[in-house]
Amino acid sequence: MTDPVQNPYISPESIAEDAPGGSLSEFVRPGQIITFALVQGVLVITAILFLFIKGEAAAANPAAPNAPTAGGGDLVLPGIGIVAAVGACVIAFALRTMLRRTSINKYRKTETKPQEIASQDASLTPAMRQLMKNSQVGTLIGQVILEGAAVMNAILMVVDDNIIHLVPIAILVAGIVIQLPTVGKKRQLAKTATDDR
């Protein structure tokens, strides 16, 4: 009776490390929700800032229609936005590829009996669960890098009042969506990890 009540969610005894559990769908669904939230965030921020600059232009003083805006006619800020977008794409996909390769190598070192995943609800081994967690983290990092560059372009759009920033924003949003986790992609990852051992 002297044992305190323990929260099963934080108790180390609640889940044995070597017990099978989890499924592909448990790793896919949260990633899809996060992807939707990231895309929605970028689109909402961009729409609000776009409406802000359009509203500002409509309320401008009609006596001075040719008054220069901050950075108006200048290509420095659009150039910065495009370079940031290209850099973010390169970093996001290179980092994701590196993390994927590292996760697969770690899986191959720790898993003694490779697991074939029959269905999306099949129970995963601890090593396969860790592979899926690492894959989830790599995808999220890549998506967040792209989101940051997209928000930066939205802010630059307000600073220089130039809608050319919508082009890199659209490309970056497409990059976020391309990384959307699916059961097929996770099964392919598992197949790649178990093949060519």
Regions picked out by a protein language model, each given a short descriptive name:
Residues 161-197:
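Alpha-helical transmembrane segments and their immediate juxtamembrane interface regions
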Residues 1-24, 117-121, 194-197:
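Low-complexity, intrinsically disordered extramembrane tails and loops of integral membrane proteins
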Residues 72-90:
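Alpha-helical transmembrane segments
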Residues 43-62:
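Membrane-helix interface motif
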Residues 32-41, 136-146:
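Select subsegments of transmembrane alpha-helices in polytopic membrane proteins
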Residues 90-115:
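Membrane-water interface of transmembrane alpha-helices
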Residues 146-156, 171-173:
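Hydrophobic, membrane-inserted alpha-helices
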Residues 111-145:
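Short membrane-interface loop/juxtamembrane segments of multi-pass integral membrane proteins
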